[in-house]
């Protein structure tokens, strides 16, 4: 099934492995803005860890005291000193309360840092979208872009929030526990440490395997999102052409790829914990055997054995957490790289230092030897030249693929010409600020774009500071006022997300009203009367006539009957102007335009 707007699978199988180090370096650069918060996180995380580390040693003293009391009671002594044990346990409880408080504070601060980073990245992505050239959106699917704003940023935030804290606590725990273990028994410490090389080797093997699958998981999630968005937006077309089975088959293929990559990545990451627990238990058994032997030899106390056993457990926990952190860092790096790739995409050329500003534009437009191709290997417009006087009505006609819509994109500087120049009032459009240039243009497209909101707000989009009276006046000039009054709520009626609660013709009248309100000097009308009934077409044509009065107008239409009164008709074929003149002149030539015109009437007949 054709993918329509979604396009192809760009780079799915050929994309290179992520640059883990480079991506994490960029992420660290982003985090420098929050260095004070991160410093506090480090301080409180270390403080919480230290209190936890000291706990087992103190608890070991209580165990030793209990053991000595039992021995004393058996041998006829004073027995167990419960007061002393109680004091030890109260002190231990205070330590754990402080540890919990510090942990809460560092968690609160780290959550704030991660959410601020999320907010900043989403803001930068939103701003970046406005600066990207149109060519980027032609090659990327909506789902892929949406995935970067939602899935990738969320993944980055969540994994960063968890991994950053665990890295700090794990490192602090390993160092602190090692010191406490050495203070109890260097020999037992050596036995416990011997598990590290085995653990690190296993972690490295699993991380290396899982890294590729995590990246594939993020990619395929974007493809699935894109297809769902596309099918939902065009579900009527899918049903009309009985393509439900094709859509389901295509979704199943994409979903199966997502399933396989997600299954492999999650399976490998799930293996880390059992393997690390097994290795930790081996060390635990070895320490228990050696500790019992040293206690018999009176080298250490019984309470020291208990403390050391807890330290061994606490020593293996950070190793297991390192495995989890390595897993989360892969997700962080995969999501971060996709976000950074988007933020580093080439932008539209910056505005010139001293851009041209026209206070009273006249609307003269000139194409001088324009050459253009969407890629350098394939030029679709060859040496296009024409001069348009202010207020003229110019029609551009030709078969599909002739380059008509491309001319509009060049006028608006959605793309820049490969050769030659386009001038407005004698100034190359590259000398203008893009925003200033586009303010001189008004567009009425076949694909009418209306947003969720009231009808009045949609019309006012052409001029945000317009009054209600201005909106009504523009709607009246666009022959939209009458039908708006018949709608429930009138100008206050809310359009839904697809604007499906008004007809196609009404949508076009609203976009014409929007253009009239904006009062541009140059108009671009792209097949604006297609897909509507004859009566509505007449009404739209009258509205357009009002809109075009005193304005330079470029009309792109396949219905040649609508552009008979054009001042100049440009006939395009394969990127070149093959004929030029008024309607009657072109018919008299009996050339390509006449063939197009006559073929439409033959089809109608």
Residue ranges with predicted function:
Residues 23, 31, 110, 130-175, ...:
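Juxtamembrane loop-to-helix connectors within ABC transporter transmembrane domains
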Residues 351-352, 358-605:
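ABC-type nucleotide-binding domain
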Residues 28, 36-61, 92, 107-111, ...:
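Alpha-helical segments in transporter systems
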Residues 180-194, 264, 268-337, 342-343:
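Helix-loop-helix
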Residues 33-36, 134-135, 153-160, 164, ...:
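An intracellular "coupling" helix at the cytosolic face of ABC transporter transmembrane type-1 domains
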Residues 33, 37-50, 61, 162-216, ...:
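Transmembrane helices of ABC transporter permease
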Residues 38-102, 183-187, 298-302:
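Transmembrane helix-loop-helix hairpins at lipid-water interfaces of multipass membrane proteins
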Residues 4-6, 10-15, 115, 123-147, ...:
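Short intracellular "coupling" helices and adjacent cytoplasmic loop segments at the cytosolic face
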């Amino acid at each position: 099934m054709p993918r329509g707007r979604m396009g192809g699978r760009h780079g799915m199988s050929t994309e290179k492995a992520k640059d883990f180090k480079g991506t994490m370096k960029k992420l660290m650069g982003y985090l420098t803005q929050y260095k004070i918060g991160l410093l506090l996180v480090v301080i409180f995380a270390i403080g919480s860890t230290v209190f936890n580390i000291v706990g087992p040693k103190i608890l070991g003293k209580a165990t030793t005291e209990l053991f000595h009391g039992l021995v004393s009671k058996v041998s006829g002594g004073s027995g167990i000193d419960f007061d002393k044990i109680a004091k030890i346990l109260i002190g231990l409880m205070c330590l754990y309360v402080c540890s919990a408080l510090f942990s809460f504070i560092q968690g609160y601060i780290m959550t704030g840092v991660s959410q601020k980073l999320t907010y900043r990245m989403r803001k930068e992505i939103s701003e970046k979208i406005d600066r990207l050239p149109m060519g980027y959106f032609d090659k990327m699917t909506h789902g892929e872009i949406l995935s970067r704003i939602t899935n990738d940023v969320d993944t980055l935030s969540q994994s960063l929030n968890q991994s950053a804290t665990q890295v700090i606590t794990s490192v602090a725990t390993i160092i602190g526990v090692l010191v406490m273990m050495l203070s109890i028994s260097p020999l037992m410490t050596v036995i416990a440490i011997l598990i590290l090389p085995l653990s690190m080797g296993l972690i490295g093997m699993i991380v290396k395997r899982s890294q590729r699958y995590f990246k594939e998981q993020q990619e395929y999630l974007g493809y699935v999102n894109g297809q769902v968005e596309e099918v939902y937006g065009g579900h009527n077309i899918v049903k009309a052409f009985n393509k439900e089975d094709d859509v389901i088959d295509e979704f199943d293929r994409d979903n199966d790829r997502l399933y396989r990559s997600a299954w492999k990545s999650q399976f490998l990451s799930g293996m880390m914990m059992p393997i690390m627990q097994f290795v930790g238990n081996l060390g635990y058994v070895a320490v228990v055997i050696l500790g019992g032997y040293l206690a018999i030899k009176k080298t250490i106390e019984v309470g020291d054995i208990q403390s050391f056993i807890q330290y061994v457990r606490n020593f293996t926990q950070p190793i297991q957490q390192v495995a989890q952190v390595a897993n989360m860092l892969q997700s962080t790096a995969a999501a971060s790289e996709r976000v950074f790739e988007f933020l580093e995409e080439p932008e539209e050329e910056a505005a010139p230092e001293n851009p041209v500003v026209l206070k009273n534009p006249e609307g003269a437009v000139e194409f001088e030897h324009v050459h253009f191709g969407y890629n350098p290997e394939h030029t679709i417009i060859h040496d296009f030249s024409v001069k348009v006087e202010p207020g003229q009505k110019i029609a551009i006609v030709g078969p599909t693929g002739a380059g008509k819509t491309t001319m509009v994109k060049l006028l608006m500087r959605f793309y820049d010409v490969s050769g030659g120049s386009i001038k407005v009032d004698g100034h190359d459009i590259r000398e203008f600020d893009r925003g200033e240039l586009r303010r001189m243009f008004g567009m009425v497209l076949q694909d009418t774009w209306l947003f969720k909101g009231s009808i009045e707000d949609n019309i006012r989009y052409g001029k945000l500071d317009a009054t209600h009276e201005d909106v009504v006046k523009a709607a009246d000039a666009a022959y939209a006022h009458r039908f708006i009054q018949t709608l429930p709520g009138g100008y206050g009626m809310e359009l839904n997300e697809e604007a499906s609660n008004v007809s196609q013709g009404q949508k076009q009248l609203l976009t014409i009203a929007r253009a009239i309100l904006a009062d541009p000097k140059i108009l671009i009308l792209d097949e604006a009367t297609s897909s509507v009934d004859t009566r509505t077409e007449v009404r739209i044509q009258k509205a357009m006539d009002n809109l075009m009065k005193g304005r330079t107008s470029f009309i792109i239409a396949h219905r040649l009957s609508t552009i008979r009164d054009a001042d100049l008709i440009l006939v395009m074929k394969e990127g070149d102007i093959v004929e030029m003149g008024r309607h009657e002149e072109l018919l008299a030539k009996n050339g390509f335009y006449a063939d197009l015109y006559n073929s439409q009437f033959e089809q109608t007949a």
